[in-house]
Every structure is written in C-alpha cells, then in structure tokens.
Amino acid sequence: MRWTTALLSLAASTLVAAQGTPVERPRPVQTYSGVVIYQPPVNYTEPRTLYARTLEIKEKGKNVLLATWENYLPNNNPNPYYPVYESFDNGKSWKERSRLYDQVNGWGARYQPFIYQLPGNLGRFRKGDILIAGNFIPQDLSQTKIDIYVSKDGARTWKFVSSVARGGEAIPNNGLTPVWEPFLYLYKNELICYYSDQRDFVNNGQKMVHQTSTDLLNWGPLRNDVAYNNTEWRPGMPIVSKLPNGKFLLTYEFFGSVEGGFSVYTRLADDPRNFNEAPGTVLRATDGTVPRGSPYNVWTPVGGPNGTVIVSSGDAPEIFLNRGLAEPGTAWEKVSIPSNTSYTRSLNILKSDPRALLVVGGGLLPGQPGVENNRVDATLWEVPSAPKKRAAAFEA
C-alpha cells in the first residue's frame, strides 16, 4: 500500500537524523478549505443539500475522488436523484459524473446515500464495482426502503441490484417504523449493510442492526448491533472502521445517554457482526467536550505507533483524535480544522498520502440557522504526526 511506502520513507529520514545528518522532511500536504463541490441554485428546496459521502477510486492509474449527497430539487421535486461528482486533483475542483435515479419504486433517491467500492469479489459482482446504498422514499414520506445499486463503469451508469429493508413513514419519531442511514462493509466474503431501525417499536425507540449478503442479491436475517431495549432511546448513524490491531470501531449517536442529547459513543469488537456484545463508551475529549450527533470515523497510520482514529460530529467544526486505538480510557484530543459545521460530515484518508484527511459536508439540518445557505464543500487537512515529545528522542 502507498501509505506503507510513505511511512518507510519517514522512518528512513528519522534514522538519518539520529546519525547527525540533515533530515529531509516529507513535503507538506497541499491543504485547502471551503472548496465548493456543489452550489445549489437559489430555488432549491430547503435544506438544499445534506448528508455528503465520498469515495476514492483508482482509474487509469490515477486517484479519483467521488462525492454524493442528498439533493433537494426545486418545488420538492417528486423524483430526486443522487448526484455523483468527480475530482481528479485531490478535491480542488469538481464536476458532475452521473446521476442515480430511482429505477424500481417510482419514489425518488431521496435520503442518506452511501457510496462504496467492493474491495473483493462478491457473487457475480467484481472487485472494483461501485455500490450506492440509499434510502428511497416517496414524496409524501410514507415509506422508507434501503436499496442497493451497482456501477460497473466507474460510477458513470447505475443499475438496481437488491433491496435490503423496508420501513414505514420517514419521520424520526418513536412509535413509527422507518429505516435509516445504510452503511456498507465487506467482511469475510459477506457484505454487511448496517442501518438504523425503528420497526421494533415495542422494545426500542430505535436500534442499530445489520443484514449480510454473500451475493448482493439475497439478504440474511436481521441482527442487532446496538439495541438497548428502551422505547425512548435512539442509537443511530452507524459507521465502522477496521483498526490495525484487528479490531473494528463503531461510532454512533445515542439519544438516551446519561450525557444528554445525541452524545457520540464508540464500541470495539473483534468481529464487525458482534457489536451488540460490546460495551458502549462515550467519547469525551481531554477538555471535557462530548461531541453530539451524526458522527463519522476513519483511521490513518499517521500519528504514532497505533496511528490515529479521527471522529467528526454534527454539532461543531472540530474533530477528535485518538492515538490509542479508541480503547476505553485513552485520550481524545479536540482539534480545530478549517471546516464548517455540517450534519454527518464524511471523512476520508487519501490513498496517495495517509496524512491527508478529506472532510466533506452537505450543510445543516432544517431549522438550524444558516440552513438556507447549505452547499456541499470540501476541506483537506493534514493529520498531525506523532507528538513531539515522542519524536524528540529520535531527533537528538
């Protein structure tokens, strides 16, 4: 992998420094902030844009970034689509590549798209195929349905593949039965589709669940990932990353937590299908901050022997860094970055440079000040290297 080469180069530079010769520092990341991916027209329906997601692919030897989001067309158009935009310069400029329309329901590609590239073969689908899982919902919001689409030509055209789950009215009130927020992850030749589920309303206000597929066509039984058996509590918005110690990290928002609001929680598991057996831990920064709402997480090898876990939330522009593999009791550092506050920002570590964190947001939720200015924008930020007190021993 490219990041391995980068780390070996950095280690070589450190060794040279220890021998008393000049250090050749790695080039700084070419950072930026406020790059506009999409500026919706003034007549778009509020909230205009929301819920951005990104993916990096390799195409003809070049790294290409893709982005998609919720797209609120003028006059509450009954047939919204997921735009897919492309960037060939690490996110400094963008243009449209394709549009994904609802092909089977007659409702619209309305909420919560997630874009994912298969890292291995799955049934008749090949490594490199690009998937979008989304919440397909009619204009009157009377139903919710998580469908999967595939592209075999680099996200230029799309074809419906299968439906994972169907729920009721698309309103996040306890007692209703919608499904929300799909997230995909391939594990041991099974594609896992995590999502939030309100259908078990007798026992749970909302819970997080998953289903798996070995062929992308048929989906297995539902399994709980976070279920508190409380009709008021609402854990939701699952995001999963693999860590270098072989464990898997789940972040989620938790309405019902003792900290209040939609506090961000984490869970660690040896198997990404068994999070319900793991304890939940609140994310609390060293300054006492508990981030709230719509978290996202990624891991990068930069930052020390364990790398760095990075978590974003929806209530502030800062991010949270952990160099202890997110284990309970390890420190979370709140760090300012030049990014806007945004509902469920997407985080992505660039393959070309593990120091480069791409942060993409689609704007604020309805009712929040500034929602009338929602747009999709990007920030590229350099992840800090190991703390200086650790590096000093090698720079003598």
Model-derived regions: residue spans:
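Long, low-complexity intrinsically disordered regions
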Residues: A12-L15, G175-P178, I192
